[in-house]
């Protein structure tokens, strides 16, 4: 299917010369440094007047066909004669330089300080800072506290006694149950649900389940980011805790009484079962499952689709289900490829033995 792509969806009427950009990112211009740049784009779609970058060698194939006005490349990247008429910026870390430029050419949306939309509903005894922004359709329960420069974009629902600290932003349709605490500079993406009941049921007679009250809350620290449609359950008692600097992708589930250590990152579709405790700086890849009531050490990296079935005492790479040290699991997988031939050989040996 043929599909056309816009030259750029991120132009913001900002113009800088390549020379200015090179100075801004502490790089070295190669070629026509007087070219004006108006936007940013991916290498394969960038057009004249846009800047892009190349850091991963596997994307080198797009370099010749790119129409970008300027390309940020590594210091040691070799340019052939065919690029003598092109403009580049050499940089020790092209990706980091490009990220810096995103903030220049695509500045973050600024919300009007001290704005409360007429359609917002605010409960009794709630305190909203004079510089906060409350968008259309927001419902704020009783005794909530919303600190300075906090933003509730629209249709956000806060149950009673929720606290949102300064400079945090809750995107559309976020729901925070009662007594949720969100720290400073947090970003909660659309559709996330914070503080819903944990999966707590007691089996009684005839296999029937009886609900166990979930009376705790969720505490999210400073500088955290929670992805779209992710869910973090409240504690059975006490608190489910997301420590400072944690980054959670879309469609992640965090169960009741979990503790996620500081600066941990959890990728999409991972699930952390109740009362598990993840150490600081863990890296949990996509579709990882973590059994409840276990602990992981700091600096643990769990590879995609692994199942963590017991506590991990030492930092390092883990893979498989149940998760094992990465190198050990790779050896097992390599051995499995030889299993059919081993079975055949054993069968032949058994036949020979039976003849004897």
Positions of predicted regions on the chain:
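Terminal amphipathic alpha-helical/low-complexity segments used for targeting or macromolecular assembly
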Residues: 1-119, 180, 185, 191-192, ...
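Structural signal for interior beta-strand "rungs" in well-ordered beta-sheet cores
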Residues: 53, 115-325
